[in-house]
């Protein structure tokens, strides 16, 4: 009897500890920053698995893969990634897109390392996944050697490399320009004051955008247009046995897909804001459409109850006795446009 009672108390105590741990984990996972980190991690992982898998098919067996297949793999991989995390973090899946949104005031800088870390980890894990799934095919194709260049090179499955007909700085210009086109079109797709994609179709339209960039402009450099797509898999290949040549090949090409997209995304965003965003007519602010500018977009405020709010001429936020002290100044022009996220 005594032993049975002790056993029951021990079991009850273990369950209480388990519930407490689970509750703590659940509490942590519900934190906004953690959810956004996990969203970027998962969406980038999904995009990269489909994208790198399509490249593996093209490199390892022409019967099953093609350049068009690579574009479709990355394009619809982006679509699936947006579906996975679009309403949580915006599903950037691209450090250049995150950087541009931070630089243009759409996302606070404190989120930049969180988003990028999630993207890098997701991309690295996707590279490890493709390596595991295609391991025997890679060895069979290359004769057991992990080569960066040559007719049996397989490092290109995971990262981009400069082709013979391109110079380093032409490649830099190419990557910057393509990423600028990407960011400009992303702003257009999500600008509700212009001709945005229909609700529910943004993910598909963004995926089609990636396909269009690939089939029309991707030949020169393989269109990395994304540090999160190129650098983590490159680091994985270095660890997995391809060696330091993954960094030195192509006049030390590795840094170009990291730096050029950052500059290009900002340039594309600025061009859209100056030439399109600033010239688009904006409807006068209505009381029922009052908005508060938050960290990651524009949030519609609910109507007040019995207290009649007023609109301050200096701020778009509804002003009432309950919230007058928390009013913030009106944002600059570029923040007044609904540009959204990737």
UniProtKB/Swiss-Prot annotation:
A motif (NPA 1) lies at residues 94-96. Keywords: Cell membrane, Cytoplasmic vesicle, Lipid droplet, Membrane, Phosphoprotein, Repeat, Transmembrane, Transmembrane helix, Transport. GO terms for molecular function: glycerol channel activity; urea transmembrane transporter activity; water channel activity. It is a multi-pass membrane protein. It is found in: Cell membrane; Cytoplasmic vesicle membrane; Lipid droplet. Residues 1-36, 86-89, 104-111, 189-200, 276-342 are cytoplasmic. Gene3D superfamilies: Glycerol uptake facilitator protein. Glycerol transport is regulated by pH, with the porin being permeable to glycerol at pH 7.4 but not at pH 5.5. Water permeability, however, is not influenced by pH. This is Aquaporin-7. It comes from Macaca fascicularis. The lineage of its organism: Eukaryota, Metazoa, Chordata, Craniata, Vertebrata.
């Amino acid at each position: 009897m005594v032993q049975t009672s002790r056993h029951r108390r021990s079991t009850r105590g273990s369950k209480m500890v388990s519930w407490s741990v689970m509750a703590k984990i659940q509490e942590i996972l519900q934190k906004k920053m953690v959810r956004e980190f996990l969203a970027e991690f998962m969406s980038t992982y999904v995009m990269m698995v489909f994208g790198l898998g399509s490249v593996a098919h093209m490199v390892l067996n022409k019967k099953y893969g093609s350049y068009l297949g690579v574009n479709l793999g990355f394009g619809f991989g982006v679509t699936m990634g947006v579906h996975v995390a679009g309403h949580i973090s915006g599903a950037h899946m691209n450090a250049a897109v995150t950087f541009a949104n931070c630089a243009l005031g759409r996302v606070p800088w404190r989120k930049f390392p969180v988003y990028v870390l999630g993207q890098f980890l997701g991309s690295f894990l996707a590279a490890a996944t493709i390596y595991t799934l295609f391991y025997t095919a890679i060895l069979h194709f290359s004769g057991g050697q992990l080569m960066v260049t040559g007719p049996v090179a397989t490092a290109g499955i995971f990262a981009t490399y400069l082709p013979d007909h391109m110079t380093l700085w032409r490649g830099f210009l190419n990557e910057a320009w393509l990423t600028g086109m990407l960011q400009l079109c992303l702003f257009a797709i999500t600008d509700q004051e212009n001709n945005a994609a229909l609700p529910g179709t943004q993910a598909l339209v963004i995926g089609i955008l990636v396909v269009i960039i690939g089939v029309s402009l991707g030949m020169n450099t393989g269109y990395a247009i994304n540090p999160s797509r190129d650098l983590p898999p490159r680091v994985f290949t270095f660890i997995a046995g391809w060696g330091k040549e993954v960094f030195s090949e192509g006049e030390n090409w590795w840094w170009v897909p990291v730096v050029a997209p950052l500059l290009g995304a900002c340039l594309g965003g600025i061009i859209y804001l100056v030439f399109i965003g600033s010239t688009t007519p904006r409807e006068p602010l209505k009381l029922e459409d009052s908005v508060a500018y938050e960290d990651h977009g524009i949030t519609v405020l609910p109507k007040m109850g019995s207290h009649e709010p007023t609109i301050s001429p200096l701020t778009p936020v509804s002003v009432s006795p309950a919230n007058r002290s928390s009013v913030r100044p009106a944002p600059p022009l570029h923040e007044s446009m609904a540009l959204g996220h990737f």
